[in-house]
Design a protein with these regions (language model features):
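Extended hydrophobic leader/signal-anchor segments used for secretion and membrane insertion
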Residues: 1-116
Length: 116
């Protein structure tokens, strides 16, 4: 009986750990607005990957989640890198409020990589 309880506790802990890792390291994001249209559509939900910054450098052409100068989370495509600063632009430039208006963003402000 004791072995059964220990096994059950281990299984519950493993399942709980799986959900914590899945939801914290790979959170789903709601796409709001049309600044990334047609790549991302308003109302879609996409997975992202946190902590990529510690293991790999940002790559031009990928879509990232970062904090803009007002500390708001933003999803845009990386267009240019200069030293530790990144330049992001939306895929729909006529409606996108991006680095064209507020300049380069420190690489440390990147929160996650959007998984496509």
């Amino acid at each position: 009986m004791t072995e059964y309880i220990v096994t059950l506790i281990i299984i519950i802990c493993v399942i709980g750990l799986f959900f914590v890792i899945k939801n914290y390291m790979f959170p789903k994001l709601d796409i709001v607005g049309s600044s990334m249209y047609p790549t991302l559509i308003d109302g879609e939900r996409k997975h992202s990957r946190r902590f990529f910054n510690r293991f790999e450098d940002p790559k031009i052409g990928r879509i990232y989640v970062y904090r803009d100068p007002t500390n708001k989370l933003v999803i845009k495509r990386l267009k240019m890198i200069h030293e530790n600063f990144c330049y992001f632009v939306g895929d729909n430039p006529t409606v996108s409020y991006d680095c064209r208006y507020y300049g380069f963003i420190d690489r440390k402000r990147i929160v996650a990589l959007l998984m496509e």
